[in-house]
Curated annotation (Swiss-Prot):
Pfam family, one: CobS
One GO CC term, this protein: plasma membrane
Protein species of origin: Pseudoalteromonas atlantica (strain T6c / ATCC BAA-1087)
Keyword Ligase appears in the UniProt entry: no
Name of the protein this chain belongs to: Adenosylcobinamide-GDP ribazoletransferase
Pathway(s) of this molecule: Cofactor biosynthesis; adenosylcobalamin biosynthesis; adenosylcobalamin from cob(II)yrinate a,c-diamide: step 7/7
Entry EC no(s): 2.7.8.26
InterPro entries, sorted: CobS (IPR003805)
Length: 269
């Protein structure tokens, strides 16, 4: 049992080191196979990030107020993850909309320089996050939104490896090479189960809407990736995570109760 727990803890540390910039012990037992197995803990990394961001928000809010704290929260999130998912969002936008053939799209996505489409996608995503999170904060729902969106968006993103082929046929030594294998059914079940616990805190109608809508987007993205590059890359997973996160925020704003403050009442009167 101790050996099993140590092995799983090593996988968790691998997942944290791969998906964040958080410090981890240097003595991690690494191999491509172990990194592939660590993908099952992607939602757990989301839980960790949500906890750190929630603590940051609660600490800074009394000093700065809502909007400045939300702005710093987004910056802190980028620092924690190294903007790995935003990088995937930008590269996918550049490749899918800037290339004509599969080969050209993959070449553009591999280019370290950002183009017009990627810049526009990043600006839209970051502005949307600020607006949506500010709205959720105004209604006292921001912490719940983080607890739902961070694990769920990551679990759904990594699930694409189950049903799509890795688009880069020849290994290019990218970070996602080690993840480019389907998961065992029991591992996939654990992945999805660990993504949704916070959704259970929602009213039933809201929970159903979030899960169904997120699954619809997941399958829409699957076919979109298939259409453009006949598979997926690590950038596609980043794109999927970002769009899922934004969708969840939007759905929570729509479904959760609103806080009517005195200023709003005065305006209506």
């Amino acid at each position: 049992m101790t050996r099993f727990l140590n092995y799983q803890f090593n996988l968790i540390l691998l997942a944290v080191s791969f998906f964040t910039r958080l410090p981890v012990p240097t003595a991690i037992d690494y191999s491509p196979q172990k990194l592939h197995q660590a993908g099952r803990y992607f939602p757990l990394v989301g839980w960790l990030l949500a906890a750190l961001l929630s603590a940051f928000y609660c600490f800074m809010l009394p000093y700065l107020g809502r909007e400045p704290t939300v702005c710093l929260l987004i910056i802190f999130s980028l620092m924690l993850t190294g903007a790995i998912h935003e990088d995937g969002l930008a590269d996918t936008a550049d490749g899918f909309w800037g290339g004509q053939s599969i080969t050209r799209k993959l070449t553009i996505m591999k280019d370290s320089q950002i183009g017009t489409y990627g810049t526009c996608a990043l600006i839209c995503a970051l502005l949307s996050k600020f607006i949506l999170l500010s709205s959720l904060a105004a209604d006292q729902h921001l912490l719940l939104a983080l607890a739902i969106a961070y694990p769920l968006s990551r679990g759904l993103a990594i699930s694409h490896v189950q049903h799509l082929a890795y688009a880069r046929k020849n290994s290019d030594n990218s970070k996602s090479d080690s993840l480019a294998q389907p998961m065992q059914p029991r591992v996939l079940l654990w992945l999805l189960a660990s993504s949704v616990p916070a959704v259970l805190w929602l009213p039933l109608s809201s929970a159903i809407l979030v899960i169904v809508s997120a699954c619809v987007l997941r399958f829409a993205l699957k076919h979109w990736f298939k259409k453009h590059i006949d598979g997926y890359t690590g950038d596609c997973l980043g794109f999927a995570q970002q769009t899922q996160e934004l969708l969840i925020y939007l759905l929570l704003i729509i479904t959760l109760p609103k806080t009517v403050n005195e200023q709003t009442i005065g305006f209506l009167l």
